[in-house]
């Protein structure tokens, strides 16, 4: 099975053209094999390129544990670059079908080469049942959540997938690996949740660490950065246009007051290509 390894700010993926490659029927099992960092290729996710009846192409993504999230911000930037450079799609603007709906990435070209990708992530969902999250009252702003005997205050947003955002004084020392998995599986979140730990540097800059649903702590999360920007604006901590600093670089996030959509701009990088044995 031919593949391309790519990353968006260290959030890495194995991309496969499932329209031409023979892909096993057990996709969760394939993802677990491929994403394993010792016995496979190693990645935060497996991305499949598929035909679509609703858009130009369809993207499916599977986490290292075999679960299938609705969307992935860093993943769709890699997807957009991959399909453009392999000739599967033409033009700078794409429409991609995902479980979160139609997502619209736009390639940023410099000298004919892809320098980055700007993605229209659509409008954030703030209603509790759309996140989804148990309880009553929307939007969910700084709501107390009991974790390991402590009370954390979370602001919850869906960017097509669920996010719980915690604002902290110092993200470097945040208990991502202990609080993150507990919140991911908290009874409040029937579909589990991604968990962001955010330090507000100023009204235009956020620093982020993330515990991703089904993947653990990763170097970056595009939908998480979008959720963090929305949460910051909703709670008055930051502006609607911010730079989100992650371990390997930055994402530019803008929550437009014009159309209520969130726009994410960042890199997508090819690492290597290869063939993975399926036998």
From Swiss-Prot:
Site description Could be important to modulate the pK values of the two catalytic cysteine residues, residues in chain: 163, 212
InterPro entries: DAP_epimerase_AS, DAP_epimerase_DapF
Main subcellular localisation: cytoplasm
Keywords, in A-Z order: Amino-acid biosynthesis, Cytoplasm, Isomerase, Lysine biosynthesis
One cellular component term from this protein's GO annotations in UniProt: cytosol
Entry similarity comment: Belongs to the diaminopimelate epimerase family.
Protein name: Diaminopimelate epimerase
Organism: Moorella thermoacetica (strain ATCC 39073 / JCM 9320)
